[in-house]
């Protein structure tokens, strides 16, 4: 006789009922809603996302189009199921619709191995591909340049396409390039990527400037004048502080999480969260498992070392790097983060900075792994349901999914309108403000992209 059978026979029926009731109570206390209650949360989540736009701060589909098909949109149909590709993508139009996405900042990313004219060309090619996406699927996408545009496009039943530039190296140390990128639709600039720029320190490189240089501060001021969001994801803590001190408008972290919960330098420490609240800005939670789970962050260190080794071994063969890295992962399984842990980061940022200063910046299609329960862009309703289960009100959820970033956009637009009345375009040059101009020790051909 099995132990379970013996226990079942020994327990009276009344006691069994009591045990089951107790188990249900414990399950609810542990955060598991009853099936009926969970269905209510899920239905409410969908209703909320039909009433208010979900605006995600960071998605790398443009990079995928460049790397997979050299920007040939006729070779990769976003209206089809891209999860069947090798490797699978996390974004396509059917899944965007299922996820009730209302607006998306598409990242126009340039590898940090590119500098000067090469970087500028690459970023404008990425900007161009976002415009062509919107033109190719007009029934689904429309370009947006203001908060009002996002809301208008959402009401029309389409998805607002916004552009975010990832990495200050992509402006080629030129404020004129920055202005032209804005004219072409870019609405945020991430001041650095993995490596320092000539005017700002990154979180993941050696600090060479002690934050922002004089030219770096001028970049922030010109962004304020233009109406471009200052994005502090990827930058060092000192760069965060310098930008917060310099900016006259609210800042954003387009895809970062809470360092108190996962001690990654890409995440935001509590003292900065409080400064973001005072600034009126927003931290948009990144879904990368290594930024969400401390266990995963520690476990991923050997993976990062292997990735670096393969990139150095095959610098001109990214497909081989991807294939060998996939084989390495198969032999070295890693733990994963969960949807609930993503919600924990939202909780923490709300608790430290306030409900008005947290949003979503998934980094889909820029991350190779995703949390359990947040596998792709179709899963946003599940995250919203989890927030409702935790007691967030519908109004607070609407702030998190899009209301907060739209508020920040409006404030940035208002600041720009005010500054443009008294301030002409900056004519500052890096060689005049920062003497001598620094040259990154990772610049081509001395190094490779650390991504």
Model-found features: residue ranges?
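Substrate-binding cleft of carbohydrate-active enzyme catalytic domains
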Residues: 218-232, 236-242, 272-278, 348
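Bacterial N-terminal signal peptides that target proteins for export
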Residues: 3-17
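Distinct, well-ordered alpha-helical segments
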Residues: 174-178, 239-249
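Alpha-helix-loop-beta-strand connector modules within alpha/beta enzyme cores
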Residues: 209-224, 243-253, 383
